[in-house]
Regions:
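Long compositionally biased, domain-poor regions of proteins
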Residues: 5-203
Length: 203
């Protein structure tokens, strides 16, 4: 049995995002004031300008004909996760993710899933691996994914009928957020900007 990722590189301890940061961001995103909306627009603009490869990858997913709940979830989680990294590490420590790094992470995710699918007796899957690497981020993501999958009533609908959310669309959004999380995690520099530790280099 193995718990850590076989294909996914470990996230350095200095790149862990705290749960409290995400809680603060969630509260700020719930603010519907004009000032808060302006700040949100600025955050999306910074994401696009500082992480063009990542923002394009997320946009490709969100530009699909997705279920409206999955679409809203994707916009919310993508900006919340990116803001968490920005606020935690700042522009000096958070490097731009290159096209090569993005492609390598996508391949690592696919390979990790294939390796674990080939060992059906393994109790840990991709979700578990990423949760170990970024526990605060993944707990936040899972909370909102689970909430999105709950059946809900249409506004103004009579009889209490509920609408099922498209689980495949939600899963596509979730996968894009996992990719975003891992790419940003490996883009973080240590406090002193030194070369990453031997644990990551040997992974």
């Amino acid at each position: 049995m193995w718990v850590r990722g076989a294909a996914i590189r470990p996230v350095p301890r200095y790149a862990i995002v705290g749960a409290s940061t995400l809680e603060q961001i969630e509260r700020s995103l719930a603010d519907e004031s004009a000032e808060a909306r302006a700040e949100l627009d600025g955050a999306f603009a910074r994401f696009e300008s500082t992480q063009p490869e990542l923002s394009d990858a997320i946009s490709q997913v969100l530009s699909r004909p997705l279920d409206e709940t999955a679409l809203a979830l994707g916009y919310f989680l993508s900006i919340a996760v990116w803001l968490a990294f920005e606020r935690t590490f700042g522009s000096e420590r958070l490097r731009q993710v290159t096209a090569d790094a993005l492609a390598a992470t996508e391949e690592a995710i696919k390979l990790e899933e294939e390796l674990r699918a080939a060992h059906g007796d393994e109790p840990f899957d991709l979700d578990d691996v990423v949760s170990i690497e970024q526990p605060g981020v993944l707990a936040f993501v899972h909370e909102h994914v689970d909430a999105a999958l709950e059946p809900r009533s249409h506004e103004g609908e009579v009889g209490g009928e509920t609408r099922e959310v498209d689980a495949d669309d939600v899963h596509a959004v979730y996968r894009s957020i996992v990719l975003l999380t891992l790419c940003l995690s490996h883009a973080v520099l240590p406090v002193d900007g030194a070369t990453r530790g031997s644990r990551e280099l040997m992974a």
